[in-house]
A protein has these predicted regions:
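A short glycine-rich, Lys/Arg-flanked "PGG" loop and its adjoining helix->strand segment in the class I
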Residues: 107-121
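Conserved class I S-adenosyl-L-methionine
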Residues: 124-146
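Short N-terminal helix/helix-N-cap motif within the alpha/beta-hydrolase-1
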Residues: 103-107, 134
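A short His-aromatic
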Residues: 97-101
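Acceptor-substrate binding/catalytic loop of class I
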Residues: 146-163, 167
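Conserved N-terminal segment of class I S-adenosyl-L-methionine
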Residues: 1-88, 92-96, 106-109, 124-126, ...
Length: 244
């Protein structure tokens, strides 16, 4: 089924398509139960539904949501918001550009783990504040890229990769299954020459998180080896149907 409406989105261009076509098919076939935390207008939730997922959308702002699918109003700063959504119900938890908005990122991650059913997988994205452009900006101006006064006002929690993997995930009882950067080898900038300079500098410096404007993170529960695994039969571009 194709959506008659396509709600707008402020997410990085192409990120939703990347998740649907290149990432999710490595772990799932469509048809499982999924929840979109921080659904916004409903753009990603609609695409998940149209691809065959059984989707629930959740967000604090009811007024922005325009997709005709089930929606629950939730405050992600609540200590146990998972209790309102159904602990252990979801094979897939998606949260695109949300964790940087919450007051307690470890608490947010714990709630994500509670929502996962055994073998379930969570997919998060967040601005890459470890990138070369971010490091250059902090060196020159002392401000964090995509977190400064010119950025989204509700960006309050920068996610630094070393701290995230070394402290946040163990405390939330989650384990890292996969880490991607988007765009994979570059940056989305208004000045192409500047993006080229940043790529050149990144190649000289070396390091895992120097490229890309966004972290794309796949997580599973670390409790009793309950994490999901990539599905070798579901690799390649996702077309809305599956051979699984």
């Amino acid at each position: 089924m194709t959506s008659e409406m396509q709600p707008g989105t402020t997410t990085a261009p192409g990120l939703h398509k990347f998740l649907l076509e290149q990432l999710l098919p490595r772990y799932f076939c469509a048809g499982e139960r999924a929840i979109d935390l921080g659904a916004g207008s409903g753009a990603l939730a609609l695409r998940l539904r149209d691809a065959g997922w059984d989707v629930l959308a959740a967000d604090l702002n009811v007024e922005e949501f325009r997709a005709g699918i089930p929606f629950v109003r939730v405050d992600f700063n609540q200590e146990n918001f998972a209790a309102e959504l159904g602990p252990g119900r979801f094979a897939l938890v998606v949260s695109v550009e949300v964790i940087e908005h919450v007051e307690n990122p470890i608490g947010f991650l714990r709630n994500i783990r509670r929502l996962l059913k055994p073998g379930g997988v969570a997919v998060l994205t967040t601005p890459n504040v470890d990138s070369t452009p971010a490091r250059v900006k902090f060196l020159l101006r002392g401000t964090i890229r995509m977190m400064d006064a010119q950025s989204e006002k509700t960006h309050i929690t920068p996610i630094f990769w070393d701290l995230f993997t070394r402290q946040y995930l163990p405390r939330a009882e989650l384990q890292l299954l996969e880490h991607r950067l988007y765009p994979a080898r570059g940056y989305q900038m208004t000045r192409p020459a500047l993006a080229g300079s940043m790529r050149l500098l990144s190649s000289c410096l070396g390091g895992e998180s120097l490229y890309g404007d966004n972290h794309v993170i796949v997580l599973g529960s670390s409790r009793n080896g309950a994490a999901g695994q990539a599905n070798p039969q579901a690799s390649g571009p996702f077309t809305g149907t599956s051979s699984c």
